[in-house]
């Protein structure tokens, strides 16, 4: 292990922001970039009249709807650390892509709209984080508006999300009467002022909760604050770093992202407390981040990031060693060596050629159709990183096209979108129509829009009489062949070449499983493993 690699790994922080739609996640992403100096002016999210859109929302459909459909990656430096921020789709229909992004991070920042509390998507995403004991920092947003009682919010997080809360800051008032926050650990009060788009100035700080200046500044609120703090300190958990790193306790911050207030404290907590890159599981062994040899896995493929170029980028999380431009690395699934000369790093949709990268960094590899989600790369060692699943889709549509002459473009478009993970594509063993599977309706809208804009294909989706899909496998090849022959009408091949059973209803699936006890029906499948 070289000292250089060890030092670089210690400097890295890789995290994702998770939230329910409209909790303020994209705004917070912008402000984190603003505070770090990565951008000079924040784009206003959903600024339809101004024509200005958020740096991290770049696909046409996102611009129309003001939601983060694709996950962007942004790298910036802050306080002698390199931060990799992964923006996840906030819309509830995009849980599968979001899940895959969460396999590539070491910690997460959970944003909660303090007027609404814990919402459905937040619950789903936190459950995904819990599978890997990911440390979570919590930000209660929108205190410049009327919000719910802060103690109630903490109780709700603990009850519903089953994670203990340790408030680090505490709000003074809300809405028009929002005065600032008290930093419990530092015994300091940060005074609120509405912040604009430009780089924020320092907020005024008053030292000590018993400072006489507070009586002059806000005589009505100060006694209530002191009473609340006494109550919070008696009833809440103290911050404990080990419990945070184990994913058992979340530090909670309060503020207003749109006003740049509370952002600095979050950034500092991620630098000071969140873990550096951790070892990763592969099929053969655990891979340490400070090992000398380069390795990594693909967690996402994005088609056409630049509408001017019909390119696809495969997003790779570096797991160990040092990546250097021009180095030879092996694409292990197809056993092919590639020269990594045009690999890129990200600042949202701005791309720069990557000269070097270390564990925790995200790099983009141009993909001409050979790379799939879950693929592993190394300097030669046969590694297959695990923990990147596909989920059984819940909604299905069959696809037709208005212009039969464009069938090739349709097939190419769906193949690319299937590999990217935007939608799951199944080719039935009998019948000509392709079947699309998704976790939510919006995914079909995205596919319709992208087929039209990127491949020039007008597609029509019809409802398909399918209830669910299960990937099937069997060690006994003879039994599998019998199963295929008997159930040809319900079988399809997915974009990864795996056999799937498309069940018309729950009863049918149950009966089929009973009839064929030797066949294994899988609700998820690993990206890197062929069933």
From Swiss-Prot:
- The source's domain of life comes to Bacteria
Gene Ontology, cellular component aspect: cytosol
Question: Keywords assigned by UniProt?
Answer: Cytoplasm, GTP-binding, Nucleotide-binding, Protein biosynthesis
**Could you cite one Gene Ontology molecular function of this protein?**
GTPase activity
Cellular compartments annotated: Cytoplasm
The portions of this protein that span the membrane are none
InterPro entries (UniProt xref): EF-G-like_DII, EFG_III/V, G_TR_CS, P-loop_NTPase, PrfC, RF3_C, RF3_dom_3_sf, RF3_GTP-bd
Report the main location listed first in the record.
cytoplasm
Q: Extract one GO BP annotation from the record.
A: regulation of translational termination
Q: Give residue ranges for domain tr-type G.
A: 10-278
Q: Where does GTP bind?
A: 19-26, 87-91, 141-144
What this chain does, per the entry, is described as: Increases the formation of ribosomal termination complexes and stimulates activities of RF-1 and RF-2. It binds guanine nucleotides and has strong preference for UGA stop codons. It may interact directly with the ribosome. The stimulation of RF-1 and RF-2 is significantly reduced by GTP and GDP, but not by GMP.
What family does the Swiss-Prot or TrEMBL record give for this protein? Answer: Belongs to the TRAFAC class translation factor GTPase superfamily. Classic translation factor GTPase family. PrfC subfamily.
Query: What protein name does the entry list?
Result: Peptide chain release factor 3
- Species of origin: Neisseria gonorrhoeae (strain ATCC 700825 / FA 1090)
